[in-house]
Amino acid sequence: MKVWFAATEATPFIKTGGLADVVGSLPLALAEEGAEVSVILPNYGQIKEQYKLEMEFLFDFIVPVGWRQQFGAVLRLKQDGVTFYFIDNEYYFKRDGVIYGHYDDAERFAYFSRAVLEMIQRVDAEEVPDVIHCHDWQTGVLPAFLRIHYQHLNRYQEIKTVFTIHNLQYQGVFPEEVLGDLLGLSHEHFTAEGIAHNGLVNYMKAGLVHANQITTVSPSYRDEIMDPYYGETLEPVLQHRAVDVRGILNGIDYRQFSPETDEHLVENYDVKTVEEGKAANKAALQQELGLPVNPDVPLFGFVSRLVDQKGIDLLAHILPDLFELDAQFIILGSGEAEYEGLFQHASTIRPDKVASYIGFDVGLAQRIYAGSDAFLMPSRFEPCGLSQLISMKYGSLPIVRETGGLRDTVQPFNQFTLEGNGFSFSNYNAQEFLDAIKRTIETYHDKPVFKHLIETAMQEDFSWIRSADEYLALYRLIAPSAD
């Protein structure tokens, strides 16, 4: 089974969010399960020089973008059993700052999607993929290009596509002129059954309409986006293709996230030494952020973008109530100025209760996972979520809203059976969130029970192998002759 991943970010090369973790980790697990996996990425200027020095030039070629013919080159790097190809074009990808949000993103990612398909004509015959796995709106037009422009050609006739929705909120929506000018498509495709949506070209919808199979990053998110509340106006399209949509839970790379080996911690630990290890990390974290060093109060962590999707409005709403609790809170993140200012102010007026760090620091984030007793994730929606998986591995019990991947991974504590690996609340409601925090504090003071919960959480297995097996089964379903 030969699988190509077409994506716009992947660890360790370039990362802006959880997509990079998936594309950096899932191919490795697939390779371990016997698949031949390649990952195709843009060759951004932001990729570190150490990786660029390892890249090998393969060929240059011409890529059609609407009526234009644009230059491109392909470089290759092999790592951990996976081949990474990099599409090189200085105009589109050698830019300072962020990799998304440019005025010509419609053109940049149309170019990238065409380039991936044009590569197939140039690689050796034995490297032609059986399946191309596309990720989020940036590669949404690739399945459309394949079906409309390429499927009739030799080498392309048997290729199938999978399109994964990582976050339906971001859809890649552009003016109608993009259709012919950049995509080379006639107006017969600008319909409700095609890639038009609300009078605009929608790259996400292109993937939903034209891919052979569609996946989401958790089973619950798959069900949620069929409903208007979560469907971001695309629920009719998803309902129409419901039989082809499945939820496959993301995993976590425990080589990257493990308290046993994490170099950012003051003391490493495992499930057998968790009491001593977390106590040392908690004291160091309290001291680092200026909180009173007190082992007897529960310490809550929050590491996220400060935006409403992450439930930050709920946290802001209950902030005065948190001041009254016998607990401490650490907030790490950046986002909307209103929330940044609010939490900075809170840490100024109540330095005994709240510590805030506006921005992002990888090492500090890891120390929060290790030093906190519980971890806050009150998300409005969460396609999968990675932080709750990390926090469990580090013995910080997640407090989550029951949505998307949070519902699929966090089993709420049952005080009668002592089952569970965290705490949860159902409705997007500040009072329910506060009640969940209070339940956690109450349980924290029952030391044997709290230790049992921590041990349960740390022993959960959300590794990528299970996800890889599900994806392999999906690939074989649509390309049964590939093996």
Curated annotation (Swiss-Prot):
One of its GO terms (molecular function) is alpha-1,4-glucan glucosyltransferase (ADP-glucose donor) activity. Keywords: Glycogen biosynthesis, Glycosyltransferase, Transferase. ADP-alpha-D-glucose binds at residue 15. It catalyses: [(1->4)-alpha-D-glucosyl](n) + ADP-alpha-D-glucose = [(1->4)-alpha-D-glucosyl](n+1) + ADP + H(+). InterPro entries: Glyco_trans_1, GS/SS, Starch_synth_cat_dom. Transmembrane segments: none annotated. Pathway: Glycan biosynthesis; glycogen biosynthesis. It comes from the Bacteria. The keyword Glycosyltransferase applies. One of its GO terms (biological process) is glycogen biosynthetic process. Its EC number is 2.4.1.21. The keyword Transferase applies. It holds the Pfam family Glycos_transf_1. Synthesizes alpha-1,4-glucan chains using ADP-glucose. NCBIfam families: glgA, PRK00654.1-1, PRK00654.1-2. Belongs to the glycosyltransferase 1 family. Bacterial/plant glycogen synthase subfamily. This is Glycogen synthase. It comes from Exiguobacterium sibiricum (strain DSM 17290 / CCUG 55495 / CIP 109462 / JCM 13490 / 255-15). The lineage of its organism: Bacteria, Bacillati, Bacillota, Bacilli, Bacillales.
